[in-house]
Amino acid sequence: MIPVRCFTCGKVISEVWEEYKARVEERKMNLQHGEVLKVGDILDDLGVERYCCRRMLLSHVELVDVLAPYQ
C-alpha cells in the first residue's frame, strides 16, 4: 500500500502510483539486453518533481503481497 501523501512535504502521491507502476513495467518489457532502466523521465511526465516525492515512489515495496499469506 503506497502512502497517500509524501512523508516530507505532504503532496498527494498515491494518485500517480498505478500509472507509474504500469509505465515501469512497460519499460521493463521493452528493455534491450544490457540496458539500464531509467525512470526519471516517467516521474517527470507524471509531474513528480520534488526529490522527496520521487523517493517515496522509487523506494516503495509492496509488503501487502508478501505478508498476505500470514493472516
Swiss-Prot record:
Q: Localized where?
A: Cytoplasm
Residue stretches in coiled coil: none
Coarsely, its chief localization is cytoplasm
Record EC number:
2.7.7.6
Quickly give the catalysed reaction: RNA(n) + a ribonucleoside 5'-triphosphate = RNA(n+1) + diphosphate
Xref: NCBIfam families:
PRK04016.1
Stated role: DNA-dependent RNA polymerase (RNAP) catalyzes the transcription of DNA into RNA using the four ribonucleoside triphosphates as substrates.
Instruction: State the protein's name.
Output: DNA-directed RNA polymerase subunit Rpo10
Organism lineage reads as: Archaea, Methanobacteriati, Methanobacteriota, Stenosarchaea group, Methanomicrobia
